[in-house]
């Protein structure tokens, strides 16, 4: 496995690859969710490149950029064990050679980025677009793999590829959950034992909503009330029912409904969602 730290070495390496290339962008602190993305890429491509880069432009002023876990050696060991072709692990100066005021301004599409996570984390998706587009240009992948847990990010990246006419297939991958049904996240390490138990209200709320839908309930307001009752011990940022353009729904639309939740457990903010 190659470990590439500079753009020059990545470009040289990429030129040597003549067959399909899968790309898995990450911020490190790899868990089984990331592993599932990597394994799918390995199955579907001749080569797989994983990036490990904690992107500063997607963190807000009061967010945990400096505290974000960076176990690089552990991440590299996992990638090598899985059979990854190369890991791109650049420094900030490699990815952002210019100071903020000198950079080209890139913005996420407003209709997908102004609500939900975009409302809670101003500028977050602009930062995501900044780094994803740079990584796509550098790796020039055949396919890129994104988890459905960060559904708003996934929709924005899909739109980015379509709008800028990029010849990249975006592959959405299912949410991976622990045995207690909590969605895997690098931020789960911040939870103590008590908070971990409290966090289980999130998947339980989604499961109960799904059961109600399966029994015939279609009114989003009633379903939301059901979910909020289960989430009452948490600080809920939102529980919303949207279509795939993130437009609010009043009734469930089969195959076109997303149920998205964000809630704080102690100081840790967790996301989850359900595709209906």
UniProtKB/Swiss-Prot annotation:
Family annotation (Pfam families): Pantoate_ligase
Keyword Cytoplasm assigned to the entry: answer is yes
Which residues does the annotation say bind beta-alanine?
58
The catalysed reaction is: (R)-pantoate + beta-alanine + ATP = (R)-pantothenate + AMP + diphosphate + H(+)
An individual GO BP term: pantothenate biosynthetic process
Q: What else is known?
A: The reaction proceeds by a bi uni uni bi ping pong mechanism.
Protein name according to UniProt: Pantothenate synthetase
**Where does this protein come from, organism-wise?**
Helicobacter pylori (strain G27)
Traced from the root, the source organism's taxonomic lineage reads: Bacteria, Pseudomonadati, Campylobacterota, Epsilonproteobacteria, Campylobacterales
Q: Which gene encodes it?
A: panC
């Amino acid at each position: 496995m190659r470990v590439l730290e500079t753009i020059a070495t990545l470009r040289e390496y990429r030129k040597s690859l003549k067959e399909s290339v899968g790309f898995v962008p990450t911020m490190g602190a790899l868990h089984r969710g990331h592993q599932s993305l990597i394994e799918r890429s390995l199955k579907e491509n001749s080569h797989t490149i994983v990036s490990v880069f904690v992107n500063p432009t997607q963190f807000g002023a009061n967010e945990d950029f400096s505290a974000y876990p960076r176990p690089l050696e552990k991440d590299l060991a996992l990638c090598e064990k899985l059979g990854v072709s190369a890991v791109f692990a650049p420094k900030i100066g490699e990815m952002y050679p210019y100071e903020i005021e000198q950079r080209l301004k890139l913005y996420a599409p407003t209709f997908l980025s102004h609500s939900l996570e975009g409302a809670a984390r101003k500028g977050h998706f602009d930062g995501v677009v900044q780094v994803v587009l740079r990584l796509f240009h550098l790796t020039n992948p055949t396919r890129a793999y994104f988890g459905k847990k960060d559904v708003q990010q996934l929709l924005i990246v899909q739109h980015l590829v379509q709008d800028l006419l990029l010849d990249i297939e975006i592959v959405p991958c299912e949410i991976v959950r622990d045995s207690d049904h909590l969605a895997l996240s690098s931020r789960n390490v911040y939870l103590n034992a008590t908070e971990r138990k409290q966090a289980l209200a999130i998947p339980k709320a989604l499961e109960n909503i799904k059961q109600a839908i399966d029994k015939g309930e279609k009114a989003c307001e009633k379903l939301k009330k059901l979910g909020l009752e289960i989430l009452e011990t948490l600080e809920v940022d939102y529980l919303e029912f949207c279509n795939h353009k993130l437009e609010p729904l009043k009734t469930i639309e089969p195959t076109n409904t997303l149920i998205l939740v964000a809630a704080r457990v102690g100081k840790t903010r967790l996301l989850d969602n359900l595709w209906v």
